């Protein structure tokens, strides 16, 4: 119950800060509200159990992009805009776009099941399903390939002879119990205890199955970094540079000479 209240509070705070981004006259205040939006969304993701994306929000958006925007705006001499007719002229267009977005959101929510709405599309048909999003009074049919709470994966259900996976309405001691429906129409009960986090399962996937792609991407980034450094280096050989060793060996007699 406390989790639901915290989720609602952070969602409303994120909506309020989002409105204040466009309502603030001072651009510095707008960027500060943008940072607050990212922080509130981070707390929402942590409550939903998606801690890896929450960390990415803090590191990338808050720690890099938003702070960069803040310093750029503070360095530039931007005048504070007044709320005049030019500002209010764009209110109808903003309301129209917001209405279209909300209509699509509610249509998506009411046309899909709870698992499909809160399930995070992960990779090649995998769905990340958080235990908060599951309605334990029902049994949901989940698409092939499953990542429950970012923890366990059925890599290829068709090869295992499995048509569908049913999540039973049993939740006890941090364990999920799944009914697996086989092609032979027989049903087995699997008691699966999940202890890994989203970050651990992502690290396992990256460094186990996609480690070669990960290394190739790292080498490409390294080459691009070295190439950018080489491009900005000054290759002019006529530039006079100091020789620290020769300067250290000089004394007063060899440095100063008197001429008539």
UniProtKB/Swiss-Prot annotation:
GO terms for cellular component: mitochondrial membrane. Signal peptide: none annotated. It catalyses: a ubiquinone + NADH + 5 H(+)(in) = a ubiquinol + NAD(+) + 4 H(+)(out). Keywords: Electron transport, Membrane, Mitochondrion, NAD, Respiratory chain, Translocase, Transmembrane, Transmembrane helix, Transport, Ubiquinone. It is a multi-pass membrane protein. Its EC number is 7.1.1.2. One of its GO terms (molecular function) is NADH dehydrogenase (ubiquinone) activity. It comes from the Eukaryota. It is found in: Mitochondrion membrane. The chain crosses the membrane at residues 2-22, 30-50, 52-72, 101-121, 142-162, 211-231. Belongs to the complex I subunit 6 family. Core subunit of the mitochondrial membrane respiratory chain NADH dehydrogenase (Complex I) that is believed to belong to the minimal assembly required for catalysis. Complex I functions in the transfer of electrons from NADH to the respiratory chain. The immediate electron acceptor for the enzyme is believed to be ubiquinone. This is NADH-ubiquinone oxidoreductase chain 6. The gene is ND6.
């Amino acid at each position: 119950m406390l989790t639901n209240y915290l989720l609602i509070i952070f969602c409303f705070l994120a909506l309020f800060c989002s409105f204040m981004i466009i309502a603030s006259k001072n651009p510095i205040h707008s960027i500060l509200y943008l940072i607050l939006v990212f922080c509130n969304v981070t707390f929402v993701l942590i409550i939903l159990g998606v801690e890896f994306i929450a960390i990415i929000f803090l590191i990338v958006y808050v720690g890099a992009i938003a702070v960069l925007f803040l310093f750029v705006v503070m360095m530039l001499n931007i005048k504070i805009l007044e709320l005049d007719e030019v500002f209010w002229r764009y209110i109808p267009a903003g309301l129209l776009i917001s209405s279209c977005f909300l209509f699509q959101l509610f249509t998506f929510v009411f046309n899909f099941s709870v698992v499909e709405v809160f399930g995070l599309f992960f990779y090649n048909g995998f769905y990340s399903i958080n235990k908060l999003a599951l309605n334990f009074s029902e049994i949901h049919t989940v698409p092939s390939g499953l990542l429950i709470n970012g923890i366990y994966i059925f890599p290829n259900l068709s090869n295992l002879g499995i048509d569908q996976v049913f999540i039973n309405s049993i939740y006890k001691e941090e364990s999920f119990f799944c009914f697996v429906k086989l092609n032979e129409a027989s049903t087995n009960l699997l008691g699966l205890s999940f202890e890994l986090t989203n970050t651990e399962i992502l690290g396992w996937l990256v460094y186990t199955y996609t480690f070669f792609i990960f290394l190739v991407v790292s080498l490409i980034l390294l080459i691009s970094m070295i190439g950018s450094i080489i491009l900005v280096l000054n290759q002019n050989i006529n530039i006079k540079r100091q020789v620290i060793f020769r300067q250290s060996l000089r004394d007063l007699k060899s440095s100063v000479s008197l001429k008539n």
